[in-house]
Every structure is written in structure tokens, then in C-alpha cells.
Amino acid sequence: MEKFTDLNYTLSVITLMNSTLHTILEDPGMAYFPYIASVLTVLFTLHKASIPTMKIALKTSKCSYKVVKYCIVTILNTLLKLAGYKEQITTKDEIEKQMDRVVKEMRRQLEMIDKLTTREIEQVELLKRIYDKLIVRSTGEIDMTKEINQKNVRTLEEWESGKNPYEPKEVTAAM
């Protein structure tokens, strides 16, 4: 019988809450009620989730200040996101991490520029050497009597032993 009365009591509480919500929602001045309710729900959830988390973190952590600071920053960033802001709150540690990352990236870029500059200088020196070798130099007087390459061409009289080396010869094979 006690379970039945508990169930009856629970149902009456739910009915009372539903009727209260319906009367609030019917009022035209409460157009923002769903937004207010969602913000209150989020705040309540954050409160219920953050208190035990912070208690455990403070007990187990050696540096409680950093934990509290991190929890507060996280809660404020969540509220800012819910409000529609794109900006976030950052701690000095995060700023230092980002600055270290930026400095590391700048060093990497400078090393890359240094390597590329060295390569470009080497390429310019190589091109200068190639250009120096390709420069036309005057060799004095050029023999233009034979314009085409006929220095190795011989006539029948110029051949040794007077025979044409390109004529086919008879070849006999041994059996």
C-alpha cells in the first residue's frame, strides 16, 4: 500500500508540474521560457558535475590552484559557447604553449628558408659556370675550305693499297 501511495504522490507532483508549465507557457509574456529553462538546466548540470569533480581534483592534485583555474576557465568557456560567442578565455599556460608552438614553427620556417637560399646560391653558381663554358671564344682563323665534315672521306687514289674497303669480298667457310 505504501508503494501505491508513493506512486500516487509522484503522479500528483508530475501533474502539478505539467499544469504549472502549461499555465506559464500560455502566457504570451513567457516566450523566452524555453531559453531560460535550457540555460538553467545547463547551469544546474554544470553545478552538479563540477562540484564533485573539483572536490576530487583538489584532494588528488598537488597544485589545486591550477585545477580550480582550469575548471573555472572551462565552465566560463562553456557558458560563452552557449551564449553564442566565438571567443574563448585562455590561461597564461595556454598562451605560453601557443607562443612556444608559434616560435617552433617560425624556427622551422627560417631553417627551410636558409636551406632554400643555400640551394639557390649553389644553383646560381652552377649556372654561372655553365654560362662561362658556353661563352663563344674567338679561336683565330677558321678553315672554311671544307664546310661539311669530309675530312675522313677519301677518294680512290687516297686509299691505301688502292682498293675500296667497302666492296664486298668473297668469303668461303670451312666445312
Swiss-Prot record:
UniProt protein name: Non-structural glycoprotein 4
Function description: Plays an essential role in the virus replication cycle by acting as a viroporin. Creates a pore in the host endoplasmic reticulum and as a consequence releases Ca(2+) in the cytoplasm of infected cell. In turn, high levels of cytoplasmic calcium trigger membrane trafficking and transport of viral ER-associated proteins to viroplasms, sites of viral genome replication and immature particle assembly.
Stretches of the chain forming a coiled coil according to its record: none
Cytoplasmic topological intervals: 52-175
GO biological process, one term: monoatomic ion transmembrane transport
Transmembrane segments: 29-51
Keywords, sorted A to Z: Activation of host autophagy by virus, Calcium, Enterotoxin, Glycoprotein, Host endoplasmic reticulum, Host membrane, Host-virus interaction, Ion channel, Ion transport, Membrane, Metal-binding, Secreted, Signal-anchor, Toxin, Transmembrane, Transmembrane helix, Transport, Viral ion channel, Virulence
Keyword Transport: yes
Subcellular location as annotated: Host rough endoplasmic reticulum membrane; Host membrane, Host caveola; Secreted
Chain positions recorded as Ca(2+) binding sites: E120, Q123
Organism of origin: Rotavirus A (strain RVA/Human/Japan/KUN/1980/G2P1B[4])
Name of a matching Pfam family: Rota_NSP4
Lumenal topology ranges: 1-28
